[in-house]
Amino acid sequence: MGRRRLLVWLCAVAALLSGAQARGTPLLARPAPPGASRYSLYTTGWRPRLRPGPHKALCAYVVHRNVTCILQEGAESYVKAEYRQCRWGPKCPGTVTYRTVLRPKYKVGYKTVTDLAWRCCPGFTGKRCPEHLTDHGAASPQLEPEPQIPSGQLDPGPRPPSYSRAAPSPHGRKGPGLFGERLERLEGDVQRLAQTYGTLSGLVASHEDPNRMTGGPRAPAVPVGFGVIPEGLVGPGDRARGPLTPPLDEILSKVTEVSNTLQTKVQLLDKVHGLALGHEAHLQRLREAPPSPLTSLALLEEYVDRRLHRLWGSLLDGFEQKLQGVQSECDLRVQEVRRQCEEGQAASRRLHQSLDGRELALRQELSQLGSQLQGLSVSGRGSCCGQLALINARMDGLERALQAVTETQRGPGAPAGDELTRLSAAMLEGGVDGLLEGLETLNGTEGGARGCCLRLDMGGWGVGGFGTMLEERVQSLEERLATLAGELSHDSASPGRSARPLVQTELAVLEQRLVSLETSCTPSTTSAILDSLVAEVKAWQSRSEALLRQVASHAALLQQLNGTVAEVQGQLAEGTGSSLQGEITLLKVNLNSVSKSLTGLSDSVSQYSDAFLAANTSLDERERKVEAEVQAIQEQVSSQGSRLQAGHRQVLNLRGELEQLKAGVAKVASGLSRCQDTAQKLQHTVGHFDQRVAQVEGACRRLGLLAAGLDSLPTEPLRPREGLWSHVDQLNRTLAQHTQDIARLRDDLLDCQAQLAEQVRPGQAN
């Protein structure tokens, strides 16, 4: 009821002030026709209490301004996404749950309100017209207190500030506002009344006195009426024309009717003014508030399209991320298989290199063993070196004996002649005879001594060098004997003379034996000994050749082992199977056993060489030991052959396991093909999802077409809302169906991952 009364009051104000246009039309005082009732805007009733003269400088203007208010327009639903983290691990994607939530919807209502503004009448300036109320550029007078409005039924109260025409909203008036079609009808009625009143006011103003229209300060105080005041001041020429002829009685009667109608509206103006003053503070706050944009159907359509586009993008991004995750996982599995194959090939290459190194080491050890055997074949003639050492020892003993003789000669008690003879005879028999016997034995083994002494570290010197050394030492002995004889002759003349012939005879005997020794050291005397040595060397060579043949058989077996390893390496290179670490470990163990056996063989060979070097006392014992060692070597070679046969059987087993690995690789390939089929099914599902998204877009287009008819919401508010809620329910059902499809796709993806894991696990175990 309050709103209806407000509308009636606004209609009355509009009818009263309908002559005002957009910029405002002033209402000036004018003389009333004879016989008409007098009425003033500044007094209430028909008998004004105060003189209206001081108030005629102010005129009431009709101004239009916009009023905004916030209204609640039902509720709207929006989709809220809730993200939940997966509990299975960081690689598992989270789940998204979409919920429909209702929230209130508001709109901003606009209303153009017609109001009264008190301003200076055109052409009035001075102390009775304040500066802030002046319309034209007149001289600014000193400000005085505003004139008091006469009290009565219509109390204007504090005069509101002047308002200019409100600028139109950038969005325009969107559809019916707060009061709907009733307000539009009232505005149409007000506009028609304004046109009618403007026509009548023009007819009345054409008969008015120009002097009174100017409203100068010298004009007499007359009752205030209605009229249209032209822009600016009235010229003096118009004043001189005088009053015009009065119009017809019909015009005056119409003016009287309008005045009576205005009198009936005064009471309504009182109530409207009171309500306006009561709502002034609220209106001021609304005027100061910035206008907010209107929520139109275009904005709603744009919002719905943006949300659907974001939802579609998020769903497509989720599918793309899942497909990329599946593809990356398949790529990682393929890279892992490739890496395992490369590791197997690298392990086979390292095994081949280690076998080559072991083969070279075995060959070097066999060559060293052959050289040691060749050295042992000649070591039987090492007694010559011992005989040379014995000769050197005897020479040293001879020198010591001479030194003792010299010291005894230099002593205070010189021995007698018979003692000298005994000493010289003992020396010659004990030292020189032994030396000559050693030389004879040395001549018998000259050929062996030459071969042995060539390997001595002190230098290579033969029989000739040894003979020169002996001659030098014999000469030194002769010189020492000569000096000894001189000393003896100097000390005792008679004993020396008796002993000199004995010494000379001893020396002559010594020279004869040396000459016989030189004559006996000829090649003809050593031929028999050399023949025996050559026969012995040939026997040793035959034995070493037999040992070399055994070593050659060993090398052939090693070459066969290398060929088998090469075949295994070729099979490893051709196969595309997974890990071969267990088989390679077994092969390494076998090779380690072979290397250990070869190491034992080398140790036994070193022991044999030590035994050969230690068995220099007897050739028979050496021969027996060599035969025993050769027999042991043969036994080890036979045992090694059995081990090689076992290794061959293990290689055959490895071939069978390689075939099994190939079968496992074929199974993995079939699993990958099934994974590809699953990926194709996922792509088909994504295509079906695109079709569903297209259906959702079609539904959104239909929703937009339905939203285009929302302008008729005030008249038909139920059917569009029901259709909108039905489309919202359809959108919710579509989202629920999409959620189920996403869950189904996730389950299919997890099943595919589980199948791949089950297929890869047996290959890793093999």
Curated annotation (Swiss-Prot):
One of its GO terms (cellular component) is cytoplasm. Glycans are attached at N66, N443, N562, N616, N732. GO terms for molecular function: extracellular matrix constituent conferring elasticity; identical protein binding. The keyword Secreted applies. It comes from Homo sapiens. This is EMILIN-3. Disulfide bonds join C59-C121, C86-C92, C120-C129. Residues 55-131 form the EMI domain.
